[in-house]
Amino acid sequence: MRIAVDAMGGDYAPEEIIKGALLAHRYLQVGIALVGRPDALEPFLPRPLPPGITVVPAEEVVGMAEEPLAVRRKPQASINVSMQQVRAKQADAVVAAGNTGATMAAAYLNLGRLAGIDRPAIGALLPTLKGKPVLLLDVGANVDCRPRFLEQFARMGSLYCQCVLGIEKPRVGLLNIGEEPNKGNDLALATHQRLTQLPGIHFAGNAEGRDVLTGDFDVVVCDGFVGNALLKFAESVGQVITQVLREELPRGWRGKLGCWLLQPNLKQVKRRMDYVEYGGALLLGVNGICVITHGSSKAAMVYHAIRLAKEAAEQKILQRLQAEMADSHPSKVNAGENAPPLASASNPSPEALPVGSLDRVEG
């Protein structure tokens, strides 16, 4: 097992990215390909390099503030080279903490879409009251969606829960403003009808915002605009709770004593609500395994992102998606036709990217 890590992407690259990758190599027994400028990586690398750690040179970088399609102008950008490692089967997955839009664009250019997929989706795992995560998708790849896109998200999410999380019959919910089938906008109404009639998934109906973290659903689908807003709100919950407890518990001697007695429990609460534990989000629907983690990721989150990528590769999620989606929804685009040859990746066809979606991708 070998994971390609874009060591140049993220607010704390390359130092924290390398630290997280070294932790993953040590504790997960996984090979790591650190992709980036050798001169930038060198100060943070142990010498000699441990067996299983390699450096793959990439002389260009797509900055956090650059537009997604900057990957076209920078064929030797670290995110492009990372994707090419998977394309050439020199790595089993990619982990990236850089520009989300650029990561998506690089995945489209170098890996292509799976057959039967109109738009790949970013799926994020969130903690729930029942202790098991819920998969929310899309959380930013497609700010505007059609009903068939959400139908495909539901299928991919259900397969992920079966393969990676071991849930035999995942409960799929459609994020909406009410439980009733007749609630919502045109997209929600049309999608509800399609999901009700869709074989192969267990559609459990509409999920209201308050239902997402209860654990009653295993998969919740929505468009990327709503999903990204919900994701960032959910990520703030743990931080807000922790801050309130820090401010209120130490008041007076009783509070200080209670804080000391409750310390193990409070640590457990923080761990359950901490999004760092979930590592990042999977880009589902491209012809390769790609985990997108926060631009603000430090070593711990990079470690968990690599763990997520490793689990997805070990459970053969890509092969399952390739088989299931191609059979269920034939598309004009398939994995063999959609990705440009490696030799021409620096001059891709404009049709290779869904520009209308990527130029507004949410980070």
From Swiss-Prot:
Keywords: Cytoplasm, Lipid biosynthesis, Lipid metabolism, Phospholipid biosynthesis, Phospholipid metabolism, Transferase
Cellular localization per UniProt: Cytoplasm
GO cellular component: cytoplasm
Top-level taxon of origin: Bacteria
Keyword Cytoplasm: yes
HAMAP family: PlsX
First-listed, main subcellular location of the protein, grouped into a coarse class: cytoplasm
Assembly information from the UniProt record: Homodimer. Probably interacts with PlsY.
GO molecular function: phosphate:acyl-[acyl carrier protein] acyltransferase activity
Catalytic activity: a fatty acyl-[ACP] + phosphate = an acyl phosphate + holo-[ACP]
Annotated organism of origin: Synechococcus sp. (strain JA-3-3Ab) (Cyanobacteria bacterium Yellowstone A-Prime)
Name of the protein this chain belongs to: Phosphate acyltransferase
Keyword flag Lipid biosynthesis: yes
Record-linked NCBIfam families: plsX
Family membership: Belongs to the PlsX family.
Annotated pathway: Lipid metabolism; phospholipid metabolism
Gene: plsX
Function: Catalyzes the reversible formation of acyl-phosphate (acyl-PO(4)) from acyl-[acyl-carrier-protein] (acyl-ACP). This enzyme utilizes acyl-ACP as fatty acyl donor, but not acyl-CoA.
UniProt-listed Enzyme Commission number(s): 2.3.1.274
Region (Disordered) residue spans: 326-363
GO annotation terms (biological process): fatty acid biosynthetic process; phospholipid biosynthetic process
Enzyme class: transferase
Compositionally skewed regions (Low complexity) per UniProt: 337-354
